[in-house]
């Protein structure tokens, strides 16, 4: 959530930022309209309170003098009733103003390229060389079905479309990748592992920005009012909701493996085969709570932490900076990491690393205290995938496939897979 003072004092910048994000700048004008009305109502309430205080003094003096005060008492009651009406109106105005502010996206950082869509994204670097095959590489879903490690037909029978069923070495590799990623992030990168709830309440979803704007993307348990998490970012970021952290403890770094659940609303007909776009998938998440003065340094470190996994696995990838029109609602700056998929002959997203500055922290009320100073400030929150597990597995199948239909297991993953070197029939 944006700082309301920023919207008031820098309305032109806020309008421009919304236009750069393909959002209607009229939201800023609507907010300012509510703000003006709020000030007018407050001024009227204060004037009436002053009038009531004067009347109260007059009544006291009249009673002291033995005079009848029926008329000023009646007038004071009318003033009090009017004040109550205005207070209700003020509360309604505040509710509408807050609801609107919740739907205004974050302001892009100055380093973010301006553009309407992914065509304006900027490639920062390409790392590694995509493999050259002397045969037509097969897609991961075909490889997995042939090896007997995927069973999409039975997954569809059990749950419907866009659900995976891993078997045998496929399930083993998925688990191996999770453990490999967590081990790197905890032992080498300094993250603390946590295992959060997979269901959260609406307040938690609001804190990270999924609600109220993106409810259609979520799975909701209507009877209980819970939501299935779309990413571990949601519960992990909210660990410190409504808390005040010590400045000396920043940055605080967590990593978490969780299943993730997404409705994939609006993706009908896209990536209908394989592991790329699923309703349920596994992901290892990285979350940071950083000092505002150091959050962009922490973003670069977080990006490097996610890249390490791909480097250790020997997968070719590229890093791109998302333009203003392609960024997520809550982000101030985002890097995407895209891994090479030979059968598709293109890069596909496998991680998104973002700095939200104080946007989420203000919604979730996550503050920090500076020693020797009055008051508190909002921390900056960051997160990134470290990595999406199913897509990593799919990339391994495609990049390390052989003409004979086998798959060579990356050296670094073999200790997690009972020292298996090859997946084959």
From Swiss-Prot:
This enzyme catalyses: tRNA(Ser) + L-serine + ATP = L-seryl-tRNA(Ser) + AMP + diphosphate + H(+); tRNA(Sec) + L-serine + ATP = L-seryl-tRNA(Sec) + AMP + diphosphate + H(+)
EC number(s) of the enzyme? Answer: 6.1.1.11
Database matches in PROSITE patterns: AA_TRNA_LIGASE_II
Pfam families registered for this protein in UniProt: Seryl_tRNA_N, tRNA-synt_2b
Instruction: Tell me the enzyme class.
Output: ligase
The Gene Ontology CC terms held by the record are: cytoplasm
Q: Which InterPro entries match?
A: aa-tRNA-synt_IIb, aa-tRNA-synth_II, aa-tRNA-synth_II/BPL/LPL, Ser-tRNA-ligase_type_1, Ser-tRNA-synth_1_N, SerRS_1_N_sf, SerRS_core, tRNA-bd_arm
GO BP field: selenocysteine biosynthetic process; seryl-tRNA aminoacylation
Localization, per the record, is: Cytoplasm
The residues listed in the UniProt record as binding L-serine, with positions renumbered to this chain, are 231-233, 285, 385
Q: Which domain of life, per UniProt?
A: Bacteria
**Binding residue positions for ATP:** 262-264, 349-352
Q: What is its main location?
A: cytoplasm
Q: Which Gene3D superfamilies match?
A: Bira Bifunctional Protein, Domain 2 (3.30.930.10), Serine-tRNA synthetase, tRNA binding domain (1.10.287.40)
Statement: the UniProt record of this protein carries the keyword Aminoacyl-tRNA synthetase: yes
Pathway as given in its UniProt record: Aminoacyl-tRNA biosynthesis; selenocysteinyl-tRNA(Sec) biosynthesis; L-seryl-tRNA(Sec) from L-serine and tRNA(Sec): step 1/1
State the Gene Ontology terms under molecular function. ATP binding; serine-tRNA ligase activity
The record comments on the domains as follows: Consists of two distinct domains, a catalytic core and a N-terminal extension that is involved in tRNA binding.
Q: What does this protein do?
A: Catalyzes the attachment of serine to tRNA(Ser). Is also able to aminoacylate tRNA(Sec) with serine, to form the misacylated tRNA L-seryl-tRNA(Sec), which will be further converted into selenocysteinyl-tRNA(Sec).
Summarize subunit and interaction data from the UniProt record for this chain: Homodimer. The tRNA molecule binds across the dimer.
- In Swiss-Prot or TrEMBL terms, this protein is called Serine--tRNA ligase
């Amino acid at each position: 959530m944006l700082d309301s003072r920023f919207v008031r004092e820098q309305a032109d910048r806020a309008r421009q930022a919304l236009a750069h994000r393909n959002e209607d700048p009229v939201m800023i004008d609507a907010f300012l309209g509510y703000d003006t009305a709020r000030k007018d109502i407050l001024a009227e309430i204060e004037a009436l309170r002053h009038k009531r205080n004067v009347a109260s003094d007059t009544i006291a003096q009249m009673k002291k003098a033995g005079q009848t005060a029926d008329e000023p008492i009646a007038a004071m009651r009318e003033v009090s009733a009017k004040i109550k009406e205005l207070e209700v109106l003020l509360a309604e105005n505040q509710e509408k103003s807050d609801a609107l502010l919740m739907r205004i996206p974050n302001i892009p950082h100055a380093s973010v390229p301006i553009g309407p869509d992914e065509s304006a994204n900027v490639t920062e670097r390409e790392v590694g060389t995509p493999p050259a095959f002397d045969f037509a590489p097969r897609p991961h879903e075909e490889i997995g079905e042939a090896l007997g490690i995927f069973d999409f037909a039975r997954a569809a029978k059990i749950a419907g479309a866009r659900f995976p069923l891993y078997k045998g070495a496929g399930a083993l590799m998925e688990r191996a990748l999770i453990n490999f990623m967590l081990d790197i992030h905890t032992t080498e990168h300094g993250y603390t592992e946590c295992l959060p709830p997979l269901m959260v309440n609406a307040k938690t979803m609001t804190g990270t920005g999924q609600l109220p704007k993106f409810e259609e993307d979520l799975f909701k348990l209507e009877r209980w009012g819970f939501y299935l998490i779309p990413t571990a970012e949601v519960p992990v970021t909210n660990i410190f909701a409504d808390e005040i952290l010590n400045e000396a403890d920043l940055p605080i770094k967590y990593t978490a493996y969780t299943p993730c659940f997404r409705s994939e609303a609006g993706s009908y007909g896209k990536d209908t085969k394989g592991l790329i776009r699923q309703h349920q998938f596994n992901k290892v998440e990285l979350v940071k709570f950083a000092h505002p003065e150091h959050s962009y340094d922490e973003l670069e470190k977080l990006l490097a932490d996610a890249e390490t996994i791909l480097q250790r696995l020997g997968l070719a990838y590229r890093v791109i900076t998302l333009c203003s029109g392609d960024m997520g609602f809550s982000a101030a700056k985002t890097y995407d990491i895209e891994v090479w998929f030979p059968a598709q002959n293109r890069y596909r997203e496998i991680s998104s690393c973002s700095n939200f500055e104080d946007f989420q922290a203000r919604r979730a009320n996550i503050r920090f205290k500076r020693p020797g100073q009055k008051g508190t400030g909002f921390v900056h929150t960051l997160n990134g995938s470290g990595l999406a597990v199913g897509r990593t597995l799919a990339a391994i199948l495609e990049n390390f496939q052989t003409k004979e239909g086998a798959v060579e297991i990356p050296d670094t993953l073999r200790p997690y897979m009972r020292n298996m070197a090859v997946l084959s029939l």
